[in-house]
Amino acid sequence: MDPVVVPLNVSWFSAGVSSAVATKLCIDEIDRIIYTHIDDQHPDTLRFLRDCEEWFGRKIEILQSHYKTVETAILMRGYGWIKQQKGGAAACTTWLKQRVRKEFEATQPKPLVYFWGMDVSESKPRPGCRSSRVEGIRDAMPKQSHRFPLVERGIGKEEAHQMLAAAGIKRPAMYDLGYHNNNCIGCVKGGKGYWNKIRVDFPEVFAARAALERKVNSSCLNGVFLDELDPKAGRHEGPICGDCGIMCEIFADAVDRHNPSHHAEPRLGGDSVDGVVGSPNKENENGR
């Protein structure tokens, strides 16, 4: 008989509420918890990560691309675009998240089972689409198996927030500021309402992204640059932009499939190879 191969169970922790609750629900089944850090995250994100480590009773591994920031990834590897307007793929996602995950996968000899924080609403077809986000993940990553603890238990976003609060864990600051996810500050996937809120809450980030758009002659929004955006455009109610993570990677994977030479172009600023660096905070590098 062939020996039984035990898979490696990995939670891709996004530092969002749903991801944290999903990880906690299956903590005894999970072998590794991994967070991909980007320097554009709100500083409170690492506080939340440390609180979750205590809640889980487990260490969260932190991986990070050596590009570190959204602007660096776009300038060094964006090839003149911030995100593709039709497909939604973001250059920063490709290099700051997707590449890091793929480099991890290349080092793993065991079958991989991924645990994701999608809630029950994301198991239903999206407006205008035949498939759900959950189905999209399975279709986009057929080499891995996938678990969705919140979906399996019928838990929605609101319930996940309630469960986190009941555990005494303060959610990331971006939620309390009125955002519906803990994405990078100034996420390039945001809509007009999102960007007008960023304009008020983080004016320096708004100005930096507007300058970046002009530098690469590509906009975050469809048909308008940020420095031309009507301050009254868009609206804030409802999710302002989707959670950053695997759905962004699905778009980026689609770009790879349709543009096989996309990543072969030389980048600006030297010949250093792509790679993953360790934790950005020594507390997590050396243990607490």
For each feature predicted by the language model, list its residue ranges:
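Nucleotide-activated chemistry modules centered on ATP-dependent adenylation/adenylyltransferase
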Residues: 1-288
